Curated annotation (Swiss-Prot):
GTP binds at residues 30-37, 57-61, 75-78, 142-145, 174-178. It comes from Amoebophilus asiaticus (strain 5a2). The gene is engB. Keywords: Cell cycle, Cell division, GTP-binding, Magnesium, Metal-binding, Nucleotide-binding, Septation. The keyword Coiled coil does not apply. InterPro entries: G_ENGB_dom (IPR030393), GTP-bd (IPR006073), GTP-bd_ribosome_bio_YsxC (IPR019987), P-loop_NTPase (IPR027417). GO terms for molecular function: GTP binding; metal ion binding. The keyword Cell cycle applies. This is Probable GTP-binding protein EngB. Necessary for normal cell division and for the maintenance of normal septation.
Length: 210
């Protein structure tokens, strides 16, 4: 998939204030400082469209970017930032959880994990939450430039082995590095397949409650 145009649309404090749910959305999430906004910029081909920072917790709202006038990429707040106040964490958790549970045009959630680290408890709990609520997701491993090629192979195998028992079907994995553009084509191809296969809004937790 070739990106011809990508524009920032809006930042929202709640899923109810997000743009109309008339296009497929691919959202990005991960622990704070996993390289989420940098990855969004790499995929979009723009260095500063999504705001990045060495300080965790920079993204605090639901940020929508319209791509090729056809679909949205969404930069979500990261989770697991210990330095955030309890009130901040509660607010972010509520905002993100409601978006994931109720946003009917969420076609796929890209869960970003640092490839240098073994699967973390907070990530595994989050992935189980996605599975329990039938939220479609794929795994994106970041910062692959920080380790050797053999370590990348070994870590990828570790993630697949760890996550396999929890998932009902095989997951899509993409190995990336925002620094050297590794995995950009693979990520774009994955997004292209998701957008091409998007047909109708998914059944959300809100739909089930009605």
């Amino acid at each position: 998939m070739h990106i011809q145009e990508a524009i920032f649309v809006t930042s929202s404090a709640t899923y109810k204030k997000c743009p109309p749910a008339d296009k497929a959305e691919i959202a990005f999430i991960g622990r704070s400082n996993v390289g989420k906004s940098s990855l969004v910029n790499m995929i979009l081909g723009q260095k500063k469209l999504a705001k990045t920072s060495a300080r965790p917790g920079k993204t605090q709202l639901i940020n929508h970017f319209l791509v090729n006038q056809k679909y949205y990429l969404v930069d979500l707040p990261g989770y697991g930032w210990a330095q955030a106040s309890k009130t901040q964490r509660i607010g972010w958790n509520k905002m993100v959880n409601q978006y994931l549970l109720y946003r009917e045009n969420l076609a796929c959630l890209f869960v970003l994990l640092d490839i240098r680290l073994p699967p973390q408890k907070i990530d595994l709990l989050f992935i189980n939450f996605l599975i329990d609520n039938d939220i479609p997701f794929a795994i994106v491993l970041t910062k692959a430039d920080k380790i050797s090629k053999q370590q990348v192979v070994n870590q990828l195998a570790t993630f697949k082995r760890t996550l396999a028992p929890s998932t009902k079907e095989s997951l899509n994995y993409v190995v990336t590095s925002s620094k050297n553009q590794a995995g950009k084509i693979e990520a774009l191809n994955c997004i292209g397949q998701i957008v091409a296969g998007y047909q109708q809004p998914r059944l959300t937790a809100l739909n089930r409650e009605l």
